[in-house]
């Protein structure tokens, strides 16, 4: 026996039934959809309909709300920034902001801002222009002679 002589066993494969190909095919005319009504039409699926049973979105209570004023920040640890400095991806001559962090590959997409976290050690003297920083991160940055500049929060 050779590779080009391999075949499926008799009856292992079966041609699929083609729908809507005449009355004699067995699935012609209505094509297995029954007669009339919304479900017989094209492009219709009743999302959330569970056959008359009370749907899950009505069984469960309403909960919470979406705060449109909430901000989502990119959280960046000092250890990752130091790693980028060591590998030469981050230029520390200029102030480091969200755009510089994105170009260095530290953050993927720009959200509402950047927040520094104190995880890891920082050895380089860097000026940061960020939305916020944890208290411990500020202390670590200022300890090596750096600076954290963030906008004043009003109200």
From Swiss-Prot:
PROSITE patterns: RIBOSOMAL_L15. Disulfide bonds: none annotated. GO terms for molecular function: rRNA binding; structural constituent of ribosome. The keyword rRNA-binding applies. One of its GO terms (cellular component) is cytosolic large ribosomal subunit. The keyword Ribonucleoprotein applies. Residues 21-35 have a biased composition (Gly residues). Pfam families: Ribosomal_L27A (PF00828). NCBIfam families: rplO_bact. Belongs to the universal ribosomal protein uL15 family. This is Large ribosomal subunit protein uL15. It comes from Bartonella tribocorum (strain CIP 105476 / IBS 506). The lineage of its organism: Bacteria, Pseudomonadati, Pseudomonadota, Alphaproteobacteria, Hyphomicrobiales.
């Amino acid at each position: 026996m050779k590779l080009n002589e391999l075949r499926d066993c008799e009856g292992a494969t079966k041609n699929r039934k083609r729908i809507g190909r005449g009355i004699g095919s067995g699935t012609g005319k209505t094509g297995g959809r029954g007669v009339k009504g919304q479900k017989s039409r094209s492009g219709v699926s009743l999302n959330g309909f569970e056959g008359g049973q009370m749907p899950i979105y009505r069984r469960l209570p309403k909960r919470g709300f979406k705060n449109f004023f909430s901000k989502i920040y990119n959280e960046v640890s000092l250890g990752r920034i130091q790693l980028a400095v060591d590998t030469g991806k981050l230029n520390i001559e200029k102030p480091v902001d969200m755009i510089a962090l994105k170009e260095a590959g530290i953050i993927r997409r720009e959200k509402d801002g950047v927040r520094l976290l104190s995880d890891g050690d920082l050895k380089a003297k860097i000026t940061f222009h960020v939305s916020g920083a944890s208290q411990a991160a500020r202390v670590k940055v200022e300890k090596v002679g750096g600076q954290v500049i963030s906008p004043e929060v009003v109200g």
